Amino acid sequence: MGPSAPLLLLFFLSWTGPLQGQQHHLVEYMERRLAALEERLAQCQDQSSRLAAELRDFKNKMLPLLEVAEKERETLRTEADSISGRVDRLEREVDYLETQNPALPCVELDEKVTGGPGAKGKGRRNEKYDMVTDCSYTVAQVRSMKILKRFGGSAGLWTKDPLGPAEKIYVLDGTQNDTAFVFPRLRDFTLAMAARKASRIRVPFPWVGTGQLVYGGFLYYARRPPGGPGGGGELENTLQLIKFHLANRTVVDSSVFPAESLIPPYGLTADTYIDLAADEEGLWAVYATRDDDRHLCLAKLDPQTLDTEQQWDTPCPRENAEAAFVICGTLYVVYNTRPASRARIQCSFDASGTLAPERAALSYFPRRYGAHASLRYNPRERQLYAWDDGYQIVYKLEMKKKEEEV
């Protein structure tokens, strides 16, 4: 061993001494941490056991209550089924009584008409209408309905253009508004956030009531000019028809409707003064005047010029009427009660005189108790588009052939 060996030994001993002290402190620290973790674990186990015991007690208390609730639910379900069966039975009995004792339909064939040409712009009055198509159908019954959704307020109009794209939907909410919603297809209209999918078209003058019509790419509607019905002034008794081009968004024509002292044609729909309709024959208008405040009037319009071609005084009463539509030149008036009950077609008027009285049967709408703010017939689909207290409904119609009058 050389002279440097003792020095190396002393250096090694001096270096390992502090290392052993650090290891000792580290072991003590780990032991303290493990003891703390064991204590916290024991506390968690005690708390878990206590919560499990409380949960068992709560479950034992709830089980009898759940059994009682289940028994009550079954009892309520049984009572509901019983009430539903009784309601169905009552409706069948009412339907039977309605078929056994139907209200007499109001039908007029207009045989005694001798009226000549009317004043300029008013058209011929009470002359039989000459059909321009071979349409010869009448309503047999309102077969079924489908509730699409609820959109807008209690009164409004939704429809399709019978001469336009088959999928496009037009929605006009309210009785005094100037903005129409246009949906590219029915599926977009049924979405929860439907308004985001719609384009908006604003007309220059607000419409009146729910008598608007989309036909051949145009929006036809009645406008109240300053001083129109309800507004006072010189034009107190007049309304102006507007023809609005939906694509160009411009007014292409307008005309003062040639009837004085206008009043709402439907006793249950006070905001509508002129109800426009379209069928296989073209454009029609339903209205009423103070000259005969008990019955409806019908007019055939020229969709190009808005001229009135013919007018008729119908036997259909205004009282309890809520809406109407035209099919193959025949006016069908829908009646209801207040408060609302089951709507029914109780009066029809064939302008051409080909509908035999016995063929104009009373027809009830499917089982829904509501009030129709508007009805629009689509001749391409043979369906009615209805607005019922904010609900948009489609009615399918069953047709039958008209019988020629002998």
Swiss-Prot record:
Function, as annotated, reads: Secreted scaffold protein that plays an essential role in dorsoventral patterning during early development. Stabilizes axial formation by restricting chordin (CHRD) activity on the dorsal side. Acts by facilitating the association between the tolloid proteases and their substrate chordin (CHRD), leading to enhance chordin (CHRD) degradation. May have matrix-related function involved in placental and embryonic development, or play a similar role in other physiological processes.
SMART domains, sorted: OLF (SM00284)
Q: Residue limits of the Olfactomedin-like domain?
A: 134-401
**Cellular localisation:** Secreted
Q: Which organism is it from?
A: Mus musculus
Name-wise, this protein is Olfactomedin-like protein 3
GO cellular component terms given for this protein: extracellular region
Give coiled-coil spans as residue ranges.
25-101
Q: Please name every pair of cysteines joined by a disulfide bond in this record.
A: C135-C328
Give the family per the record: Belongs to the OLFML3 family.
Q: Which residues have a glycan attached per UniProt? A: N177, N248
UniProt signal peptide = 1-21
The record, for Pfam families, names:
OLF
The gene name on file is: Olfml3
Ordered alphabetically, the record's keywords are: Coiled coil, Developmental protein, Disulfide bond, Glycoprotein, Secreted, Signal
